[in-house]
Amino acid sequence: TLNSMEGYYCTADLTRFSKDSEKKFGIKQYYKMSGEYRMEMTSPDDVAGNYTVYDGKTVCQYNPRVEGKIIKDVPENKARNELFLGCFIKNYMQSEEVSIAVSKTDESRCTVLEAVIPGENKFTSTEKLWIDNETITPVKLVIYDSEGKEKYIVEYNEFQFNPDFEDGIFNIN
């Protein structure tokens, strides 16, 4: 469950909304509650194979289509971090304004948790997490801007709590 989660692996569909467009991506996420993460892009083709890794100290981006392939010492990116379920859990636990609601989707009944994202960023202000009541796994995570508009939607396809991560999955090469 979320309370006892030490890490997770998932595949998901990510939708990013900007002023007049929306972009969809396939992603894989690997995350440890101690903060290390890896996010791989699986689609569309022009970004497939790109990934970002945080080893606990440094963020590194890898792009197989670029000479040199690796960008080290990437600045911390609040919006990118918020795409991880672990960040939602930390925000939810620390948030003074949280809410819990019940929702019925086409497939199942869900519990919806809402949290405020610290830092007063107008693009990432609040977030909601839908959890399937039967499987107790995340269904989707939505991040809203300060006007309540959807900025990011992560729709989980496959989700695994506390996986055995491959050695080196969070290493920066």
Describe the predicted segments one by one.
Residues 30-32, 55-57, 74-80, 157-161:
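A short, sequence-level motif marking secondary-structure junctions
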Residues 102-172:
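Gly/Pro-enriched, hydrophobic low-complexity segments
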Residues 23-27, 48-52, 70, 125-127, ...:
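Short beta-strand segments
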Residues 39, 78-87, 137-139, 161-166:
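Short, surface-exposed linear segments at secondary-structure transitions and domain or protein termini
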Residues 45-47, 66-70, 119, 146-147:
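Short, surface-exposed beta-strand-loop junctions and turns on beta-sheet-rich folds
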Residues 89-102:
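A short, amphipathic edge element
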Residues 60-87:
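Acidic/charged, solvent-exposed loop-and-adjacent secondary-structure segments enriched in E/D, K/R, S/T
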Residues 1-64:
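N-terminal mature ectodomain segment of secretory-pathway/periplasmic proteins
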